[in-house]
Amino acid sequence: LLQSMEGYSKQYGWQDLLLPWSYSAGVFDGEFYSAPKTYETMIMLYNKTLFEENGWSIPTNLTEYESLAKAIQSKGMHVFSYGSTGWQPTHEHIGGMYLNSYAGPDNVYKALIGEKKWSDPEFVGAVELLRKHMVDDGYWSGSLENYYALGWDDFHAQFANRGAAMMTIGTWTFQTTENVFKDISDDWDWAPFPNLTAEGGDPSYLLALGTTLSINGKSDNPDAAAKVMDFVFKNKAIVLDMANDFNFGEFVVPLKFTESDFGDNVNPKVKRYLLTFAEETGKGNYGYTTWTFWPSDPGVHIWKDMEVLWAGEITSQEFMEDHEKLWKKARKNNATLPVGKR
């Protein structure tokens, strides 16, 4: 069991130091128990050199997105590089992106807190669009079979070798992506995944916690543990230095970073991500990842049974009706996770 850190938070002023959403994610029954050590989000990497050569632009709505996909495929390349070998829950990465980008973060929030059903049309539509793009159109690595067959090293190599023009992945990829591009002439960059409605709109940055810091309920010296955490939260330079060692794939504490906090040794692409993420999520422009905000059973269902849907054994409507049943059970058993008020 964990010890409440509510008293330490008030003593040291942690709520003022952390990004609002990240602090709220650690509050249970009104008490602060869990401090974020690493945050992450889903992004869209793209081969910048390839885009410039072909005059392609980052899509901002569904029409532009599907038009770009056709243009990429007409060049004999895959739209995205990605795969699930070695980590079956990879499916939830893409599933969460579509739920937020198609149904919208406001609707996802309402479903998380029980004000909407997961079987509502906007969620069924999101899952069906993903099924179409994955199974029918082969956006990811050319086909569903290829997607299932590729692992971490495979899809990074495919992206770097122009086998695919883009890659949907989390920000934990920064270090690996930088490494696979360092010896080639092409350059890469990142963009938020587009809003998949017809009219487009501002894309959302999905909130996710990779690792957290807490105090063991049986700790013999909780005061010392709290002092260590306070030292981390109040020393941006040290946090950035440690995170930079991992090219910001780990130890990315969600502090309120500003331009002046970064040294010249930080990758400009990563720096832009950290500043943009802090600014946009601070304004409330954020969505939700399944591995941070979904309870256990629905969280497994969203990726495990996705394969049943993709195999054509059930419809998107049936898939989301089953998902809603698991959420009802989780609420009945008080097994849901805290979601900060939007």
Regions found by a protein language model. Give the residues of each.
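Glycine-centered hinge/linker elements that transmit conformational signals in sensory
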Residues: A69, I113-Y147
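Short, solvent-exposed loop/beta-turn-alpha elements that line the ligand-binding surface or hinge
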Residues: S4-L18, S101-G125, N179-D183, N195-S204, ...
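Alpha-to-beta junction loops
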Residues: L1, G76-H78, N161-I169
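A structural signal for short loop-to-beta-strand junctions that line the ligand-binding cleft
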Residues: Y12-L50, H78-S84, G200-L206, N285-T292
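Mature extracytoplasmic/periplasmic domains
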Residues: L2, W172-N179, F193-L196, T211-S296, ...
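Hinge/lid segment of periplasmic solute-binding proteins
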Residues: L1-M42, S57, E66, I72, ...
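Short helix-initiation/N-cap motifs at beta->coil->alpha
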Residues: L62-S67, L144-A160
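C-terminal capping/gating helix-and-loop segments adjacent to ligand/active sites or protein-protein/ligand interfaces
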Residues: V27, L112, L207, K269-K328
